[in-house]
UniProtKB/Swiss-Prot annotation:
Residues 1-20, 95-98, 160-167, 215-233, 287-299, 343-357, 432-485 are cytoplasmic. The chain crosses the membrane at residues 21-41, 74-94, 99-119, 139-159, 168-188, 194-214, 234-254, 266-286, 300-320, 322-342, 358-378, 411-431. Belongs to the ammonium transporter (TC 2.A.49) family. Rh subfamily. This is Ammonium transporter Rh type C 1. It is a multi-pass membrane protein. It is found in: Apical cell membrane. Keywords: Ammonia transport, Cell membrane, Glycoprotein, Membrane, Transmembrane, Transmembrane helix, Transport. Specifically expressed in the gill by mitochondria-rich cells. It comes from Takifugu rubripes.
Length: 485
């Protein structure tokens, strides 16, 4: 008990947001480390190396157009836009934290993708003949996926941490992601094309666990900056639209060429469309006078894309995709209305962006849908070759049957949750140390501590908020059941 009390006392020391030494030191040292590690380990793969001509002749490839670049790069472009524009602008809803939302998103994504190429390369792309990691366009897509988990986690602690803390969060998050991805995809042999388990479930619970460890009992001192204003919600909606439009590319980017990739895009497209309607319906039903809440429209409309990710390449059927989107729109929106305030009040989890409702819960639903769909697969639906190709029943897993594959899918979901929660608690303990330059409770959700602001912004008084992503609004009875004031 004495050690615990000493640790708490240490962590409760006065805050100092001056990162003039720590932030440049971390950026310079870690970037130099990346240069050295890339020099030692990273090389072009056979499709991006100058020996491609020889490889093409050896494999009897007739044209350069068959290079993987031309198959994957359109999807890579879409995923890249989602990472840097979609996630970045989605988090600009806070009235005084737009620089931090977009700028720090940019920072940790740029660092994270470099570290991800190394970590994922050591697990998946290491050539044991020369000890080098061979990278191509698919490696870039996987690195962006890896970064997405950390950006999801950032949403839980948005406005409450320093850029140095975010770099540490990303360093450990990428490392944990690479390990859990290897366990789920390679050892357990679960399929997760759109990352419902590997990306969203892990990233969601990783961020929530960190937020729980960094709980601020006096965060209400920054409540005047915790909401949005009209123009900040419009900017956040831009992020939503970019994510919504490109999510079919996200879920299909690394699936097998041909029918699997085609099917993944269709399933995601339909799930997203269905989610929009149910989100609007629930938002109107549970708000006073039937008005829509922009929080729900910005976030819950994307939940279907998250939940359909694992089963995106399976024979989910178009109506099945619509059902997944329908259910997720309801669950995610109700999560914002009831679950987020409950978690803050009773579980001490301050979830700034509501990632539990957009990523964690839909990710778990996606894992469950994937397990059920895999277990229900049959030769009559998939065909013999289709079943083998879709679930990769080859090599050590050639005797696998669909029902057993369903169990492996469920096991993969459990691993993602355990890594997210366990890793988040450990990293949260590290981030609680008073050496990272995080803001005081009365200075959160504010760009001023870390950014040079225009003079008119520095002197501007706080704007009264009209929309708060974390507010516990009063609930009153209506003819439909419950309604919010």
């Amino acid at each position: 008990m004495g050690c615990v009390q000493s640790f708490r006392t240490l962590c409760d020391r006065p805050k100092n947001t001056n990162v003039r030494i720590s932030l440049p030191a971390v950026c310079f040292v870690w970037q130099i480390a990346m240069i050295i590690l890339f020099g030692v380990f990273i090389r072009y793969d056979e499709e991006s190396d100058t020996h491609w001509i020889e490889h093409r002749k050896k494999e009897n490839i007739s044209s350069d157009i068959e290079n993987d670049f031309y198959f994957r790069y359109p999807s890579f472009q879409d995923v890249h836009v989602m990472i840097f524009v979609g996630f970045g602008f989605l988090m600009t809803f806070l009235k005084r934290y737009s620089f931090g939302a977009v700028g720090f998103n940019f920072l940790i994504a740029a660092f994270g993708l470099q570290w991800a190429l190394l970590m994922q390369g050591w697990f998946h792309s290491l050539d044991y003949t020369d000890g080098k990691i061979k990278i191509g366009v698919e490696s870039l897509i996987n690195a962006d996926f890896c970064v997405a988990g950390c950006l999801i986690a950032y949403g839980a602690v948005l406005g409450k941490v320093s850029p140095v803390q975010l770099m540490v969060l990303t360093l450990f998050g990428i490392t944990l992601f690479a390990v859990e991805e290897y366990i789920i995809l390679s050892l357990i042999h679960a399929r997760d094309a759109g990352g419902s388990m590997v990306i969203h479930t892990f990233g969601g619970y990783y961020g929530l666990s960190i937020s729980w460890m960094l709980y601020r009992p006096n965060l209400d001192q920054s409540s005047n900056l915790q909401g949005s204003v009209y123009h900040s919600d419009v900017f956040a909606m831009i992020g939503t639209l970019f994510l919504w439009m490109f999510w079919p590319s996200f879920n299909s980017a690394i699936t097998d060429h041909g029918d699997g990739q085609h099917r993944a895009a269709i399933n995601t497209y339909l799930a997203l469309a269905s989610t929009v309607l149910t989100t609007v319906a629930i938002s109107s039903l549970f708000q006073k006078h039937g008005k829509l809440d922009m929080v729900h429209i910005q976030n819950s409309t994307l939940a279907g894309g998250v939940a359909v990710g694992t089963a995106a390449e399976f024979m989910l059927m178009p109506y099945g995709s619509l059902i997944v989107g329908f259910c997720c729109g309801i669950i995610s929106t109700l999560g914002y209305i009831y679950l987020t305030p409950f978690m803050e009040k009773h579980l001490k989890i301050q979830d700034t962006c509501g990632i539990h409702n957009l990523h964690a819960m839909p990710g778990v639903i996606g894992g469950i849908v994937g397990a059920i769909t895999a277990a229900a697969a049959s030769e009559s639906v998939y065909g013999k070759e289709g079943l083998i190709n879709t679930f990769d029943f080859e090599g050590a897993f050639k005797n696998m049957v669909p029902t057993k594959q369903g169990g492996h899918q469920a096991a993969g979901l459990c691993v993602a949750i355990c890594f997210g929660i366990g890793g988040g608690i450990i990293v949260g303990c590290i981030l609680r140390l008073p050496i990272w330059g995080d803001p005081a409770d009365d200075n959160c959700f504010n760009d001023e501590p870390y950014w040079e602001l225009p003079e008119d912004e520095e002197s501007a008084p706080p704007i009264l908020h009209y929309n708060n992503h974390m507010a516990n609004k009063d609930v009153v009875d209506t003819n439909f059941g419950m309604e919010q004031n």
